């Protein structure tokens, strides 16, 4: 089982994903739960070096180069972590995946959507999540969280304006309409409230999942 979590920066997806992993460990005690993230991946030196480069405020790169770097890190992530884990029958939860590239590089940065989609289909060999959970949060709330928790330490990708994030959200809305396995969850509540919404949805969704 492969589940990705999506949302704009400071949407709470990282925290909620970790909480959801604890729920899955109880629901599926016989399964190993693997949590990971993009860009980068847990303990993947090369992919994490790309992540550090992408997030650094000191690096000024074009949207096209950004797209290629994300794709490169994703391929490493797949080869070294995601594919082996799925092959071993583990449940993989990933904080960001291909949909982030479409929403951020495609809609946010204005690159051709078909180009971004085709590139990521190629490098992933059409490996897509069984389920994608998109935490839909107001931009004002996300910016409030960024200010409270990160102050002046925002990275290059977080340090963008409202107009950019509006485009990104439009991208996620596009994906929600296009992909039958892409589901929107209200992310404006507390972490526990959002987790309850996800668990309630997952229980119903998994009950109808082909076994």
From Swiss-Prot:
ATP binds at residues 7-14. Keywords: ATP-binding, Kinase, Nucleotide biosynthesis, Nucleotide-binding, Transferase. The keyword ATP-binding applies. GO terms for biological process: dTDP biosynthetic process; dTTP biosynthetic process; dUDP biosynthetic process. GO terms for cellular component: cytosol. It catalyses: dTMP + ATP = dTDP + ADP. SUPFAM superfamilies: P-loop containing nucleoside triphosphate hydrolases. PROSITE patterns: THYMIDYLATE_KINASE. Pfam families: Thymidylate_kin (PF02223). Transmembrane segments: none annotated. Its EC number is 2.7.4.9. The keyword Chloroplast does not apply. One of its GO terms (molecular function) is ATP binding. Belongs to the thymidylate kinase family. This is Thymidylate kinase.
């Amino acid at each position: 089982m492969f589940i990705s979590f999506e949302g704009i920066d400071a949407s709470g997806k990282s925290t909620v994903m970790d909480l959801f992993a604890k729920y899955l460990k109880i629901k599926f005690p016989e399964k190993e739960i693997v949590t990971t993230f993009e860009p980068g991946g847990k303990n993947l030196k090369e992919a994490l070096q790309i992540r550090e480069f992408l997030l650094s405020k000191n690096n000024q790169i074009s949207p096209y180069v950004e797209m290629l770097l994300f794709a490169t890190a994703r391929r490493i992530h797949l080869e070294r972590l995601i594919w082996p884990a799925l092959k071993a029958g583990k449940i993989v939860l990933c904080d960001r995946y291909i949909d982030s590239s479409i929403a951020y590089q495609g809609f946010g940065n204005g690159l051709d959507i078909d180009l971004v989609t085709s590139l990521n289909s190629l490098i992933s060999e059409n490996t897509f999540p069984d389920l994608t959970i998109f935490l839909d949060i107001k931009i004002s709330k996300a910016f409030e969280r960024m200010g409270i928790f990160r102050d002046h330490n925002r990275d290059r990708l977080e340090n963008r304006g409202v107009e950019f994030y509006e485009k990104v959200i439009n991208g996620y809305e596009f994906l929600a309409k296009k992909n039958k396995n892409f589901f929107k969850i209200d992310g404006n509540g507390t972490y526990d409230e959002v987790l309850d919404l996800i668990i309630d949805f997952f229980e119903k969704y998994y009950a109808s999942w082909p076994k």
